[in-house]
């Protein structure tokens, strides 16, 4: 089952400047489209700052573009000036060489939070990942309060981001909702996806809920649709007012036989294909 995303941002929202990092990426584009529909229909989020390493060529009238590399601390401080809230979708999105992940996801997250502190920004919605717990066995039910079991450098970098979020809340009052996102793609592609899929409309609903909920402190939630066989807890959804509406079940007959090689870590662990990546050569 899938839902229409047209009305997925209908909750009351503030009118201040919002920043989306990683605006040129797949998830950034989904959010920008949703915000554009919201502005056209209801006049909300009139000022949207969008950022990526490369220029965007499809800017809306409501969008202000700032080209910025997450690893550039000074540039990040400029990027956050005047920003009330951040939806952080930027960074390295898949498992790869540690050095690449270090610069984008570790140095980049430090730069983001330090810039937010200096700018007085008080809310971050962080794209964390299910790969923070990707070494749990497939089928095991996992909640945010269980020990981390990252499945690679990427998962470790997202665990680092969650740690930074906690520290910057406890010391400086910057609230964060860490979204341990599942498989955010147009449709589930394999048997794993029957448990991990997060539809685009549910992703938009989740992000908006995390952005607008009051008094979240530092909260970690899993981002997944209403899949009957999902592996992850709904803990924290009630705190932000998120309800998943879509389900991967509509593709079960088509994809349930699409599995990873028997006996491989990809078939055993929740991280799936990420368990088949690496080790990587020393030079990059």
Annotate each predicted stretch with a short phrase.
Residues 40-57:
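Conserved glycine-rich Rossmann-like NAD(P)H-binding loop of the short-chain dehydrogenase/reductase
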Residues 71, 100-111, 119, 148, ...:
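Glycine-rich NAD(P)-binding loop of the Rossmann-fold in SDR/ketoreductase-type enzymes
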Residues 111-149:
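Conserved Rossmann-fold NAD(P)-dependent oxidoreductase catalytic core, especially the SDR/UDP-sugar
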Residues 57, 63-104:
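NAD(P)H-binding glycine-rich loop region in Rossmannoid oxidoreductase-like domains
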Residues 103, 137-176:
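Catalytic helix-loop patch of NAD(P)-dependent Rossmann-fold dehydrogenases
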Residues 57, 220, 226-243, 247, ...:
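Conserved C-terminal active-site "lid" loop/helix of NAD(P)H-dependent oxidoreductases
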Residues 15-41:
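N-terminal Rossmann NAD(P)H-binding glycine-rich loop of SDR-like oxidoreductase domains
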Residues 181-187, 197-218, 226:
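Alpha-helical substrate-binding/gating segment
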């Amino acid at each position: 089952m899938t839902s229409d995303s047209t009305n997925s941002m209908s909750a009351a929202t503030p009118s201040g400047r919002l920043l989306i990092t990683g605006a040129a990426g797949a998830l950034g584009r989904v959010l920008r489209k949703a915000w554009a529909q919201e502005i056209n229909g209801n006049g909300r989020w009139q000022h949207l700052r969008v950022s990526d390493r490369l220029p965007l060529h499809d800017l809306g009238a409501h969008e202000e573009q700032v080209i910025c590399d997450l690893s550039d601390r000074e540039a990040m401080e400029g990027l956050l000036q005047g920003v009330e809230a951040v939806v952080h979708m930027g960074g390295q999105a898949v498992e790869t060489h540690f050095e690449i992940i270090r610069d984008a996801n570790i140095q980049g997250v430090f730069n983001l939070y330090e810039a937010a502190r200096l700018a007085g920004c008080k809310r971050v919605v962080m794209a964390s990942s299910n790969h923070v717990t990707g070494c749990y066995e497939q089928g095991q039910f996992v909640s945010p309060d269980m020990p981390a079991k990252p499945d690679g450098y990427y998962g470790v970098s997202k665990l680092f981001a969650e740690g930074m979020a906690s520290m910057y809340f406890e010391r400086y009052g910057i609230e964060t909702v860490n979204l341990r996102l599942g498989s955010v793609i147009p449709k589930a592609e394999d048997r794993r996806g029957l448990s991990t899929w997060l539809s685009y409309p549910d992703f938009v609903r989740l992000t908006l809920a995390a952005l607008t909920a009051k008094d979240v402190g530092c909260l970690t939630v899993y981002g997944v649709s209403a899949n009957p066989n999902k592996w992850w807890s709904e803990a924290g959804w009630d705190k932000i007012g998120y309800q998943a509406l879509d389900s991967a079940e509509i593709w079960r007959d088509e994809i349930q036989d699409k599995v990873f090689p028997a006996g491989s870590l990809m078939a055993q662990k929740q991280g799936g294909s990420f368990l088949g990546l690496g080790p990587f050569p020393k030079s990059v």
